[in-house]
Amino acid sequence: MAATAQPDLVVRPLLRKDLDKALDVWVSAWQTAYPSIDFEKRRDWAAEHIADLEQDGALPSVAVRDSAIVGLLVVDPNTGYLDQIVVATACQGQGVANALLAHAQHLCPNGLDLHVNQDNARAIRFYQKHGFVVTGPDVNARSGAPVHKMSWRP
């Protein structure tokens, strides 16, 4: 099931052959958001994390434009948990995240829940623009960073 936001952008399931390029996007997006952290060192963790989530029912997807992977989505339709939306740095602000979120909403029509770092103002604005509300504070179990719990309901 593919969702399109623009004629030249397709969201489709992540294939094993896509993983390295999808992880390149993951590293670059997080590196842009948090330049003081070396996300390349977290690449193997990200690959294992995505595989674990997929084994538990998550559906990783990629946004593809002109045969290049420009975004990554990891969402679990069974729980409505949105684990990741990341967009290649060069493609940010071009509707890729909108397409990925629309795909997540299509897969989870009853609603989505997520955690977002409290200091990630750009992501918080993006989610609020799309109808998400902050439902409470939490702490990232891996990093100890304060996060917001956010939810979207149709």
Report the location of each language-model feature.
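Acetyl-CoA-dependent GNAT
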Residues: 13-90, 101-103, 107, 140
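Active-site acidic-Proline motif in GNAT/NAT acetyltransferases
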Residues: 88-94, 118-119
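Conserved N-terminal entry element of GNAT/NAT acetyltransferase domains
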Residues: 1-17, 152
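Conserved acetyl-CoA-binding loop-helix of GNAT-fold acetyltransferases
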Residues: 93-106, 125, 129
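Conserved acetyl-CoA-binding loop of GNAT-fold acetyltransferases
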Residues: 128-137
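Short glycine/proline-centered loop/turn elements that form peptide/ligand docking sites
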Residues: 97, 101, 119-123, 140-146
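Short hydrophobic/aromatic beta-strand or adjacent loop that forms the aromatic wall/cage
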Residues: 58, 145-150
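Conserved GNAT acetyl-CoA-binding A-motif
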Residues: 107-119
